[in-house]
A protein has these predicted regions:
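Acidic (Asp/Glu-rich) sequence patches and key acidic residues
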Residues: 1-126
């Protein structure tokens, strides 16, 4: 079954305190980090199956970030430290859509977005 992962990455100088403060500021639970290392990356993910309604992750992530840019900057986190990463596993056809308002907001925010597409049907035959 195809899956889609909408991911928010926030890079910072390694610090348990900063990791916890980012969690508190954004008010969502990040993916667990390696507890043996001091975290330098905060990572939040939305996951869905292809049959589900497409999540408007751009607007969702910006709704989390925009009211908190000043607080994040006080933690030493600038927009260049933030990345949206969309990973799309597909079978037969890669098809995705984004709202105009989301793309406009993303462009105005100065945040980078990466998109990776993987045809998982090739992995089935391996």
């Amino acid at each position: 079954m195809a899956k889609q992962y909408s991911q928010l990455f926030i890079d910072f100088t390694a610090s348990y305190e900063t990791y916890q403060k980012v969690t508190d500021v954004l008010g969502v639970t990040p993916q667990p980090h390696d507890s043996n290392e001091i975290p330098d990356l905060w990572f939040y993910r939305l996951e869905r199956c292809s049959e589900d309604r497409q999540e408007d992750f751009i607007n969702h992530f910006l709704d989390l970030l925009e009211p908190n840019f000043e607080e994040l900057e006080r933690l030493g986190i600038n927009r260049k430290n933030i990345l949206f990463w969309y990973v799309y596993e597909y079978e037969y056809q890669c098809s995705m859509s984004f709202t105009p308002s989301g793309l406009l907001r993303l462009g105005e925010s100065g945040i980078t977005m990466n998109i990776d597409c993987h045809d998982f049907t090739h992995r089935k035959s391996l």
